[in-house]
Amino acid sequence: MTTLTRQDLNFGQVVADVLCEFLEVAVHLILYVREVYPVGIFQKRKKYNVPVQMSCHPELNQYIQDTLHCVKPLLEKNDVEKVVVVILDKEHRPVEKFVFEITQPPLLPISSDSLLSHVEQLLRAFILKISVCDAVLDHNPPGCTFTVLVHTREAATRNMEKIQVIKDFPWILADEQDVHMHDPRLIPLKTMTSDILKMQLYVEERAHKSS
């Protein structure tokens, strides 16, 4: 079977485009389903042939877009291990983490079913899982906020410094105390495997959210 490297056909860029589009939809939907923001700021749209809820709040949308704009060059270079949406309580302690573990193969097998043919269908299944995840999660306390964390491979440090200069959107090293949860409950939501991408989504949930 013929194989391509990540550089051929701008493979890394194609995967990064697909992932960033998906992550944008996923973040909006998580914020809606977990009621981080009032339902009134969301509008129903259609993505991946399923209904989703997308924010129409300009500042929130800009933050999400800026974040993913800076993540994209790291995805292109396969420097991202995890993208994590962290929901924080009023004391800025994490109550939930939606963890997207991302693995991209160094070589791409070429076949009639490879590249992007099945990826949209697989991503649709993730969106559907997020839509109903509140059935397996406890209610969050009122007044929650969120942040996005990116776990990178060690080699990504220099790339991130360059991106900060170019994008004018500073990355801040996360304080472990700010993002650590003691003995969280782990809830697997979805796993996908394709020729160009492997991804797993799970939630880490704090045991006692009201304390």
Swiss-Prot record:
Gene3D superfamilies the UniProt entry points to: HORMA domain
Function description: Adapter protein able to interact with different proteins and involved in different biological processes. Mediates the interaction between the error-prone DNA polymerase zeta catalytic subunit REV3L and the inserter polymerase REV1, thereby mediating the second polymerase switching in translesion DNA synthesis. Translesion DNA synthesis releases the replication blockade of replicative polymerases, stalled in presence of DNA lesions. Component of the shieldin complex, which plays an important role in repair of DNA double-stranded breaks (DSBs).
Listed InterPro entries: HORMA_dom, HORMA_dom_sf, Mad2-like
Entry keyword set: Cell cycle, Cell division, Cytoplasm, Cytoskeleton, DNA damage, Mitosis, Nucleus, Transcription, Transcription regulation
Region (Mediates interaction with REV1 and REV3L and homodimerization): 21-155
Subcellular location field: Nucleus; Cytoplasm, Cytoskeleton, Spindle; Cytoplasm
GO process annotations (BP): cell division; DNA damage response, signal transduction resulting in transcription; double-strand break repair; negative regulation of protein catabolic process; negative regulation of ubiquitin protein ligase activity; positive regulation of DNA-templated transcription; positive regulation of peptidyl-serine phosphorylation; regulation of cell growth
Domain of life: Eukaryota
Subunit structure and binding partners: Homooligomer. Heterodimer with REV3L. This dimer forms the minimal DNA polymerase zeta complex (Pol-zeta2), with REV3L bearing DNA polymerase catalytic activity, although its activity is very low in this context. Component of the tetrameric Pol-zeta complex (Pol-zeta4), which consists of REV3L, MAD2L2, POLD2 and POLD3; Pol-zeta4 is the fully active form of DNA polymerase zeta. Component of the shieldin complex, consisting of SHLD1, SHLD2, SHLD3 and MAD2L2/REV7.
Entry-linked PROSITE patterns: HORMA
PANTHER family: MITOTIC SPINDLE ASSEMBLY CHECKPOINT PROTEIN MAD2, MITOTIC SPINDLE ASSEMBLY CHECKPOINT PROTEIN MAD2B
Transmembrane segments: none
GO CC term, one of those recorded: spindle
Protein's UniProt name: Mitotic spindle assembly checkpoint protein MAD2B
Organism: Bos taurus (Bovine)
GO molecular function, one term: JUN kinase binding
Positions of the HORMA domain: 13-203
